[in-house]
Amino acid sequence: MKYIFMVAGKGSRLQPLTFKHPKSMYKLDENTTLLQRMVGLIKKHDPEADIVLVTGHMHRRIEEQVEGVRYIYNPFYEVTNSIASLWFAKEELDADNVILIDGDIVMEDELVANVLCKPVDKPVVLVDSSIKTDGDYNVEVSGDQVLVMSKDLDNYYGEYAGVTLLDRESARLMKTEMESMVEDGYYDQWYENALVQLIFKNDFKLYYIDITNYDWTEVDSVNVLLLAKRIHTQELTEG
C-alpha cells in the first residue's frame, strides 16, 4: 500500500516551537519524533509499505532523521497549501490503495493496525464523532456517506482526523480534480477540498470511518503536544 505524508507546512500555530524544528520532528521521547512514530507503526503493520513524505519547511532536517522512505519536495511551501504538495506527488496516486496522512497526526497502535493499514475498495475519510465543537476541519454526514467537509460548519457530525484512504478509481478522480484546481490557481487550498468538489460536481460518494473509540490527536497546539506524548508513553508502558 502507498502512504503519502504531508509534512511541508511551517506549523505556524505552534510557533515559536517550530522556528527551528518542523512540528513533525517534535520528540515524543528521547529517541522518537512524531513522524518517526507514525512511519514506524505503519512499517510494523504493513512491512511492504511504500511511504512517501512530501516535504517543504526545513526539509533537510526531516530527511536526516526519517529513513526507509521516499521524499518529494514542494519548493513553494511558503505560498501554497497541501493541495500543491500533493500535486508534486501526483504520480504517486497511481496505486491500488493510497493513504493520505497529515504529518501532524499521532495515533495509537491499534488504530494504525485496524484502520490505517487495511486496504479499501472505496474512498474513506477518518472522522471523530466525539468532537462536536471547536473542530478544525469538520464533517457532516448522512447515513454512511460524507455530505460536506469544511472549516465553516456550525453543526457537524465530527472532526476530520487528517487521514484519507483511496482505492485506485477514487485516487484517479482525486488526481484529476486536484490538477484542475491547481491549474485554476487554487494552490492555497487543502487537498481535502478536492474531495468536496468531487462530491458537489460529480455525485462522488465519499464514505467515513468513525474512530471515536481510538486514541489519536492532531498536533496543533502546545496542549495537544502533551496529549500526543501521553498516547506515546502509555503504549510504551503497556508494551
Across the structure, where does each feature detected by a protein language model lie?
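Conserved N-terminal catalytic core of the sugar/cofactor nucleotidyltransferase
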Residues: 2-5, 13, 32-96, 184
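Conserved alpha/beta core of the MobA/IspD/sugar-nucleotide pyrophosphorylase nucleotidyltransferase superfamily
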Residues: 1-3, 142, 160-239
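Glycine-rich N-terminal loop/short-helix segment of MobA-like nucleotidyltransferase
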Residues: 1-29
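Phosphate- and divalent-cation-binding pockets in alpha/beta enzyme and binding domains
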Residues: 13, 61-62, 110, 173, ...
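Conserved beta-strand segments of alpha/beta enzyme cores
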Residues: 24, 50, 70, 205-207
